[in-house]
């Protein structure tokens, strides 16, 4: 299973591979992407893995399809949205183009990030960053919805975001399930104890989701009690 990249040497390796790999474009229809095991069984597996490294460096961990972006835009229409830990800001930029009022917040500006540091992800492009700092400091605020995509593994960030939200705010989470390589156990326990899941919205986002090989990420939507 792919784990979050934390070691500086691994970040450097990904950035090197990303320089020569062809681009895997995000935002295409779901039918354009191989997914999961199909990817691993492809005769172009080596090329696809190299493309994934470039994708990590330029976009992030989540393979966003056109259908998922459409579903998010529909779900978020007319809402005030905070993306907590926006990374490259690619998703926030696309949603902003769709008229969504979204604020992209991240404590790392990857345009100026120290690559010798073990903090953060191997991202080298930033499409949108509205707030450079800890997104938790912006909560609860006047936001209707908080978007949390691939929060850092085995850190308290995801849990802190969920705890800082107020009753009635909606969380849209994308990442692996409990025991996977996003967030920590306390975050998932807090979701169970403090949020009401929204099954229909979760299914709508997940039905056209595509995954990288070895990754079991998915969408989850819930409202804080």
Can you say where each PLM-predicted feature lies in the sequence?
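C-terminal substrate-binding/active-site "lid" region of AdoMet-derived donor-dependent transferases
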Residues: 154-225
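Gly/Ala-rich phosphate-binding loop of Rossmann-like dinucleotide-binding domains
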Residues: 96
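S-adenosyl-L-methionine
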Residues: 1-76, 108-145
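Conserved SAM-binding motif I beta-strand of class I
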Residues: 101-107
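A short SAM/SAH-binding and catalytic strip from SAM-dependent methyltransferases
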Residues: 143-156
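Glycine-rich SAM-binding Motif I of class I
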Residues: 89-93
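Conserved class I S-adenosyl-L-methionine
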Residues: 78-87
């Amino acid at each position: 299973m792919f784990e979050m990249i934390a070691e500086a040497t691994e970040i450097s390796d990904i950035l090197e591979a990303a320089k020569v790999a062809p681009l895997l474009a995000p935002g295409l229809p779901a039918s354009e992407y191989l997914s999961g095991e199909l990817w691993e069984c492809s005769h172009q597996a080596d090329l696809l893995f190299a493309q994934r490294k470039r994708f990590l460096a330029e976009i992030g961990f989540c393979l966003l399809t056109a259908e998922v972006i459409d579903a998010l835009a529909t779900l978020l229409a007319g809402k005030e949205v905070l993306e907590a830990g926006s990374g490259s800001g690619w998703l926030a930029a696309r949603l902003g183009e769709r008229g969504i009022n979204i604020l992209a917040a991240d404590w790392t500006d990857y345009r100026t990030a120290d690559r010798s540091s073990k903090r953060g992800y191997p991202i080298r492009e930033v499409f949108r960053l509205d707030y450079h700092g800890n997104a938790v400091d912006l909560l609860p605020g006047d936001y209707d919805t908080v978007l949390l995509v691939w929060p850092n593994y085995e850190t308290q960030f995801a849990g802190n975001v969920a705890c800082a939200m107020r009753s009635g705010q909606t969380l849209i989470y994308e990442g692996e399930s409990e025991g996977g390589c996003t967030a920590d156990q306390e975050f998932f326990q807090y979701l169970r104890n403090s949020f009401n899941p929204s099954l229909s919205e979760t299914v709508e986002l997940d039905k056209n989701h595509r995954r990288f090989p070895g990754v079991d990420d998915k969408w989850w939507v819930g409202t804080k009690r």
